[in-house]
């Protein structure tokens, strides 16, 4: 454990947060609004989703994505046909050395939780605009808001209070208690980190701390932190320019005059040289599966269905890898359709490189259920009102996600 520190929630912030029902997402625009003073911006709305906290605030409706909700994006046209019927998630011949997790924003925080807690299963992680393990600590949503980039200052930069020291202390303790897998598993594992220099939602310092944390435990890290990107998942199929903030939070960036492909970068780290990306019609199948058999329920702010992409070769019995892909807040299927699944740019590589991709899905929820109006994955303990074990193997939502991995891999 290294030295570090935490600034507890200041009285002024507590005062600001006292009328939690005053926080609302502007459903008439895809972009953030900018109130005076401390700007209650996208980190609150996206990475944490506190709108209406404690009082059943409205979850964003279809208007939040404006007319783009009706667009037919290019990636959708070339992807495997969209899922129409709900089936049962199947087991495939998965190579245990090729099981990975990836996520953006709330899904990035959740990906770190899954990777750290189940490091004997996951052999690598790709994290976009997430943060250190157990970043929210025991303080729930308010702690997440104060310490993990939840408020944006007048300088348009997310505020930040480091949780690195507390994170590593908790991680070490839980590893010794065996509530998570041994931390020694992280040594040598490939980890990809993405942080845009223009990110107003998750402070780049949070991702710098995550880089330090993974380095501390001996992971092999590639840190992409030089692109002038706003908050979002980067891929050639992203419909937003690199520096644009807005729904569906899927951006495309360029490097040396060419379109960049962050997914190619981390898949190469994980798998070695790749077969070419399929930019045409995919041979694999995109299908919906029943999440409820794994314990998904409105009480965990989880949808009844998720999506899975299965390359034809994997369906025919070839040995394949697995990617568990976790979306961010305001990227749930009920809000943006299949744009996360088709614009992430994973399926195109998975199709030619034998990777099954599982896309769990969340739903927005509010009191009397979990306060999660922006359909974030649980990285502060909202499940079942409050889950103190949210970052452990026994965490309620973590258990659901891992059960999906167990089904696909056949791992006990």
Residue ranges of each PLM-predicted region?
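Alpha/beta-hydrolase active-site loop
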Residues: 77-93, 167, 171, 178, ...
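Primarily recognizes the serine-hydrolase "nucleophile elbow" in alpha/beta-hydrolase
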Residues: 96-143, 177, 275
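Bacterial signal peptide processing site
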Residues: 54-57
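Short beta-strand element of the alpha/beta-hydrolase
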Residues: 318-330
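C-terminal motif of bacterial Sec signal peptides marking the signal peptidase cleavage site
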Residues: 49-52
